[in-house]
Amino acid sequence: MAEITAKLVKELRDKTSAGMMDCKKALIENKGDMDKSIEWLRQKGIASAEKKSGRVAAEGAVGSYIHTGSRVGVLLELNCETDFVARGDLFQGLLRDLSMQVAACPSVEYVSVDQIPESIANKEKEIEMGRDDLSGKPDQIKAKIVEGRIGKRLKEMALLEQPFIKDSSINVEELVKQVAGKIGENIRVRRFTRYILGEGIEVQGPDFAEEVASMTSG
């Protein structure tokens, strides 16, 4: 197996315009074989999708999903380049799958890690730095542990980082790239909203003292 060097990854990226992580994964999967790695990226729809990623995706559709029991609902905006593609079965299927994904992932609040405000990342760091299991550890080791934990936590909040509910061997970002490759257009998840029945409503129950008094009176 050829060593997967940074130079090899860059060479594959230059040939396919795919992302660095996708290129590295392709080379690992194909034991460093360049031709097989290129074919692997094409089969995944990644290479062609990356080449189109600079084009503006201003069309698309807003999809909805209501979970069984009508207790959770999702609205999601998915963009593409043309109205023709937006009406197609592949795009509409992706829109529904993504809406279902949001409904199934209560921790997800943002489309990507890049969208998470710095204030939230700082708050997570503050929480992790204060954990008891880190006390007494050298600062350098503590910093690495905290960095890893924060990275994991932020990924849990991002839709594109989630394992796809219908195929956990890929994440949502890879799913979007695959469909974009098949369609031949850039696809972008712009935003979503999740509604949970009763969320934020404070249920008023009887005052405990009054309840006891009513039971003992008379």
Curated annotation (Swiss-Prot):
PROSITE patterns: EF_TS_1, EF_TS_2. Residues 82-85 are annotated as: Involved in Mg(2+) ion dislocation from EF-Tu. GO terms for cellular component: cytoplasm. InterPro entries: EF-Ts_dimer_sf, Transl_elong_EFTs/EF1B, Transl_elong_EFTs/EF1B_dimer, Transl_elong_Ts_CS, UBA-like_sf. Keywords: Cytoplasm, Elongation factor, Protein biosynthesis. It is found in: Cytoplasm. One of its GO terms (molecular function) is translation elongation factor activity. The keyword Cytoplasm applies. Gene3D superfamilies: 1.10.286.20, DNA helicase RuvA subunit, C-terminal domain (1.10.8.10), Elongation factor Ts, dimerisation domain (3.30.479.20). SUPFAM superfamilies: Elongation factor Ts (EF-Ts), dimerisation domain, UBA-like. PANTHER family: ELONGATION FACTOR TS (PTHR11741), POLYPROTEIN OF EF-TS, CHLOROPLASTIC (PTHR11741:SF10). Associates with the EF-Tu.GDP complex and induces the exchange of GDP to GTP. It remains bound to the aminoacyl-tRNA.EF-Tu.GTP complex up to the GTP hydrolysis stage on the ribosome. Belongs to the EF-Ts family. This is Elongation factor Ts. It comes from Prochlorococcus marinus (strain NATL2A). The gene is tsf.
